[in-house]
A protein has these predicted regions:
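Conserved ABC ATPase signature
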Residues: 130-137
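Conserved ABC ATPase "signature" region
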Residues: 111-126
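A short, flexible loop at the N-terminus of ABC-type nucleotide-binding domains that lies
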Residues: 1-31
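Helix-to-loop junction immediately C-terminal to a conserved catalytic motif
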Residues: 52
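Hydrophobic anchor residue at the start of the ABC signature
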Residues: 144, 148
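Q-loop/switch helix immediately C-terminal to the Walker
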Residues: 86, 91-107, 113
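Conserved ABC transporter NBD signature motif
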Residues: 57-76
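ABC-family nucleotide-binding domains
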Residues: 158, 165, 169
Length: 211
């Protein structure tokens, strides 16, 4: 039996002048791990930005724990963790300070989990480096460490295994296995295929390409 939904999406419309991405999209996100599945160009990353409240839909509603993204955007966004790969906002920030910012923004931030993630993802040598100095894979590890520690109701992960080494992939898999048993938090994982051996709360098929 599914636990009560944390995030409700109803009649979501979003597109660009030359392409409609979503026309009347509706679904619910329940505690555990949900796969947002689709190929290149189908709008997976755009949908994550919509769910994060980083961009607004043309119409439709998004609610987390009955908080509307349109009516209470600040309260809505405070319940979401989302690290936008295209953002340069933290490029000059050290890894340690980035974690401090995330801790200040998320009331449920778990310092013990952060310490485990720093060790599990091999981030100790990079703690005092600015993000712009990091490789793509290491920067992705920083975002993942914050994601697993944040304690947010909704955590959004965009292709989390990309550019990771073997030990880091194993660590992420273990954390997602734990996340699948969550009763109060949801992880939304955007990827082409489901990660092996992870019990999914649901699968949302976005499609192979944009409409």
């Amino acid at each position: 039996m599914l636990k009560p939904a944390l995030l409700n999406v109803d009649a979501l419309h979003f597109g660009y002048p030359d392409a409609l991405l979503f026309g009347g999209l509706s679904f619910q996100i329940h505690p555990g791990v949900t796969l947002l599945r689709g190929g290149d160009g189908c709008g997976k990353s755009t949908l994550l930005r919509l769910l994060a409240g980083a961009i607004e839909p043309q119409s439709g509603t998004l609610c987390i724990n009955n908080v509307s993204a349109h009516e209470q955007p600040g309260v809505y966004r405070a319940q979401v963790f989302w690290a936008d790969p295209q953002s340069t906002a933290f490029e000059q920030t050290t890894v340690r300070d980035y974690f401090a910012v995330q801790s200040s923004q998320h009331a449920g931030f778990d310092q013990q989990m952060l310490a485990s993630a720093i060790e599990g993802l091999g981030l100790e040598p990079h703690i005092h480096k600015a993000l712009f100095m990091l490789s793509t894979g290491t920067k992705r590890k920083v975002w993942l460490a914050a994601a697993f520690a944040c304690g947010a109701a909704i955590t959004l992960l965009d292709e989390p295994f990309t550019a990771l080494d073997g030990p880091s992939i194993a660590f992420v898999m273990q954390q997602l296995t734990n996340a699948a048993r969550q009763t109060q938090r949801a992880y939304v994982l955007a990827d082409y295929v489901a990660p092996a051996a992870i019990a999914l709360a649901s699968v949302i098929d976005v499609g192979e390409q944009a409409a």
